[in-house]
Amino acid sequence: MAKEYSRTQRIGDQMQRELAQLIRREVKDPRVGLVTITAVEVSRDVGHAKIFITVMGQDSAEEIAQSIKVLNAAAGFLRMQLAREMKLRSVPQLHFHYDESVVRGAHLSALIERAVAEDSQHPSTPEDAKE
């Protein structure tokens, strides 16, 4: 029987909590907006971690790219701080990525709302009622 909750998932969850606090507390760069860590994927060998983020208030691709660049530049510092907080033999290398799923989800929700609004504007015909 497979483990329901693997070690890498537990490490990822703890890293997500710790990194959220560290970024808020330690990263003072004004180019980084309000960062939300949406997910952390840790490799099986615990050598690398992909950190997926969204940045509140930054909609343009340039601003988002700048935030990612700043966070990737601070990855070594954040990794060192994580090592102090977490009790791991080795802390994974951090790689920050923008999480586009939130933007895609909002876009799909807007499309659904628009389709529902268009359907409510068209009266149903008797042929539709028979089906």
Swiss-Prot record:
Assigned keywords, A-Z: Cytoplasm, Ribosome biogenesis
Keyword set includes Cytoplasm: yes
Location within or outside the cell: Cytoplasm
Main localization of the protein described in the UniProt heading: cytoplasm
Any single GO BP term: maturation of SSU-rRNA
SUPFAM superfamilies, per database record: Ribosome-binding factor A, RbfA
Highest taxon of the lineage: Bacteria
GO CC terms: cytosol
GO molecular function: ribosomal small subunit binding
Assembly with partners or alone: Monomer. Binds 30S ribosomal subunits, but not 50S ribosomal subunits or 70S ribosomes.
Function: One of several proteins that assist in the late maturation steps of the functional core of the 30S ribosomal subunit. Associates with free 30S ribosomal subunits (but not with 30S subunits that are part of 70S ribosomes or polysomes). Required for efficient processing of 16S rRNA. May interact with the 5'-terminal helix region of 16S rRNA.
Similarity remark: Belongs to the RbfA family.
Protein's name according to its UniProt entry: Ribosome-binding factor A
Gene behind this protein: rbfA
